[in-house]
A protein has these predicted regions:
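Extracytoplasmic
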Residues: 23-25, 66, 70-74, 81, ...
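Bacterial Sec-dependent N-terminal signal peptides
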Residues: 1-24
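A cross-taxonomic marker for long C-terminal extensions/tails that follow the last structured domain
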Residues: 287-320
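N-terminal segment of the mature soluble domain
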Residues: 42-131, 236-298
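Active-site-proximal beta-strand/loop segments in catalytic clefts of secreted hydrolases
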Residues: 31-34, 89-91, 135-136
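Amphipathic beta-strand/beta-sheet edge segments enriched in Tyr/Trp
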Residues: 130-179, 310-319
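Extracytoplasmic/secreted cell-surface and envelope-processing proteins
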Residues: 38-41, 96-99, 140-145, 226-227
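C-terminal/domain-edge helix-coil "capping" segments
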Residues: 21-44, 166-254, 308-309, 320
Length: 320
């Protein structure tokens, strides 16, 4: 009987290990925070349709700050030990530049367009789920009884959902004083707080898989006026047709029609399935493409899908 119970316990342990190993974890990318970039002047100007905005210059930061690369590498190792897949910024940017075949601004035949920042493009092309932002400051300190000159580091980690840009997990702390180099001091401080950070990430990702990803979905028409959302099909206005489709294809019919006119509809907090029927990860573009095909096949309505990052998509009706 004891041998039977022992065998049963061993089988249960093996099953738990297998489940832990096969549990899906989000894909991550580690980047410096806005504050870190600004404090070290790693910023640049971006022209957003005539309006100049300041954005982080990650490429210059990784190229010129050797400490940053070491810090990101150390944190990447910690996250990998928890089973996360970590994408490398420099490698992803090199791949993006090699296959750059479209402009940052996509234009229709009629001259309409959508702007996308370099960070939006990175998220869309590299397709990672969570962005880990690291910020740290170095303080002068003394070490040991002999009061040897050293330093301590206070840090903040933030996990950002790349689909919504919402902060979904945080961690902060202060290291003990040390004479080690900053990346090693920071590694120890982050490691001491990693368990809680990992728990926050795991709970959030479990919720996504159960309740769906959250995206923003915009429907609008071209200026040509070939079609509008009040046009009727089989007695229903087009906006009602689209809402019916949204109800059938979102997780538990969850979405919010925040604004609607005859030329534009804004759907927010749209919960899309985590995977499509083929078991592939679904993003905003693939979800909108399903509606585009439905409108084309059922109502002969042409439309074009435009994206901004991973979590915002625009379906423009009336032409391609």
């Amino acid at each position: 009987m004891k041998r039977h119970n022992l065998l049963l316990c061993m089988l249960l342990c093996i099953a738990q290990i297998v489940m832990a190993q096969t549990e899906k974890k989000p894909t991550l990318m580690i980047l410096p925070s806005d504050h870190w970039c600004s404090a070290r002047y790693f910023t640049t100007n971006f022209d957003n349709f005539g309006k100049t905005i300041v954005i982080n210059d990650f490429q210059s930061a990784f190229r010129e700050d050797s400490e940053l690369s070491m810090v990101v590498s150390k944190i990447g190792e910690l996250m990998a030990n928890y089973g996360y897949m970590v994408k490398d910024y420099s490698q992803e940017m090199a791949a993006i530049n090699d296959r750059q075949v479209e402009n940052e601004v996509t234009m229709s035949k009629m001259g309409s367009m959508i702007s996308e920042t370099p960070l939006d493009m990175l998220r869309r092309r590299a397709k990672y789920d969570i962005e880990i932002r690291i910020d740290w400051d170095v303080n002068k300190d003394v070490v040991g009884k002999k009061k040897v000159e050293g330093k301590s580091v206070n840090f903040t980690l933030q996990a950002i959902d790349t689909y919504t840009s919402k902060v979904v997990a945080t961690s902060s702390g202060v290291s003990e004083a040390s004479t080690e180099i900053v990346p090693r001091i920071l590694e120890g401080a982050v490691a001491a707080n990693m368990e809680n950070f990992n728990d926050q990430l795991t709970r959030y990702f479990d919720n996504l898989q159960k309740n769906g990803r959250e995206i923003t979905f915009i429907i609008q028409t071209w200026d040509s006026g070939m079609i509008d959302l009040e046009e009727e099909f089989d007695g229903d206005e087009l906006i009602d047709v689209i809402q019916d489709w949204m109800f059938e294809n979102t997780v538990d019919g969850v979405f919010n029609l925040s604004d609607a006119t005859e030329t534009r509809a804004l759907f927010e907090q749209v919960r899309i399935p985590f995977f499509n029927e083929k078991g592939r990860a679904m993003d905003a573009r693939s979800f909108a493409t399903q509606l585009r095909k439905h409108l084309a096949n059922t109502y002969m309505i042409e439309s074009k899908v435009l994206t901004r990052g991973l979590g915002e998509v625009i379906l423009v009706l009336g032409e391609k």
